[in-house]
């Protein structure tokens, strides 16, 4: 493993997660990795009949609600299936690119969508004393795993942060027309991410598990870039420094949002205009 000098991201964890092969419907290796990792850390770990994984760390303050992180365990990279069946790890390559570090595989498709999101979520969880995380199967099949979850698990959750968007400087304002937050929440907590952390734009996302959570719970939901590029292609790669920034962003947001419940009614809310959600880091 090449040492990269990242600021907050656990580099071993990052490489370990990215080397685990996964494919839609064949998430067993990734599930086993997350479960073993969580048990080693002393987290409460549960799975359901779908194969989704639920983690809880720490004890809430009285009257508090958990921050929750989420990502999905499957990828679209079919060439990873032989590695799954033969219990082998993906051979990772690291090279410098424009002063940063690009992580990829030669010809197998990295599957950073959404293994990078898993690594970022677990990296944030390491840094937080109290946190929940859920990792879903079969997102690429139409969010099948998240649709089958038991949403009573979210009753003590205050808000949900997903990492299932490309690059670092992009985030979702909506998914398939489901608005993830309202203008008041954006102005109070998200607008500052541009000048403080370099998040440059929000956009309309086609679909991901966070829209299912938003629809079922009414909680404020967010979806941020996990540092992957060229997703769903054989040339997919991750930028380690962007994953590092994604961890920093999550830590910052959880400290800002606290252990309170941020509920935003779905009914009557309209999608925010794109122009209201575009801003630059030097604004």
Show where each model-derived region lies:
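Active-site metal-coordination/substrate-binding segment of hydrolases
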Residues: 63-130, 157
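His/Asp/Glu-rich mid-to-C-terminal helical/loop segments that flank catalytic regions of hydrolases
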Residues: 230-283
């Amino acid at each position: 493993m090449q040492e990269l000098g990242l600021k907050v991201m656990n580099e071993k964890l990052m490489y370990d997660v990215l080397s685990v092969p996964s494919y839609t419907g064949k998430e067993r290796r990734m599930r086993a990795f997350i479960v073993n990792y969580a048990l080693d850390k002393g987290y409460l770990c549960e799975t359901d009949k779908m194969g989704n994984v639920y983690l809880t760390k720490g004890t809430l303050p009285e009257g508090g609600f958990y921050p929750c992180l989420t990502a999905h365990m499957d990828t679209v990279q079919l060439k990873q299936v032989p590695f799954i069946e033969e219990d082998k790890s993906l051979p990772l390559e690291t090279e410098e690119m424009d002063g940063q570090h690009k992580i990829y595989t030669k010809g197998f498709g990295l599957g950073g969508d959404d293994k990078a999101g898993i690594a970022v979520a677990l990296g944030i969880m390491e840094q937080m004393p109290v946190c929940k995380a859920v990792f879903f199967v079969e997102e690429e099949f139409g969010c099948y795993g998240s649709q089958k979850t038991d949403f009573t698990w979210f009753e003590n959750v205050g808000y949900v942060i997903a990492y299932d968007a490309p690059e670092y400087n992009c985030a979702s304002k909506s998914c398939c027309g489901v608005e993830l937050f309202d203008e008041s929440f954006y102005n109070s907590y998200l607008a500052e991410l541009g000048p403080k952390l370099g998040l440059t734009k929000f956009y309309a996302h086609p679909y991901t598990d966070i829209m299912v959570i938003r629809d079922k719970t009414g909680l404020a939901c967010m979806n941020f870039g996990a540092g992957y590029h060229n997703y769903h292609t054989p040339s997919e790669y991750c930028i380690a420094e962007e994953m590092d920034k994604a961890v920093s962003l999550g830590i910052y947001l959880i400290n800002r949002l606290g252990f309170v419940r941020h509920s935003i009614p779905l009914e009557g809310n309209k999608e925010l205009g794109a122009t209201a959600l575009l801003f630059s880091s030097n604004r």
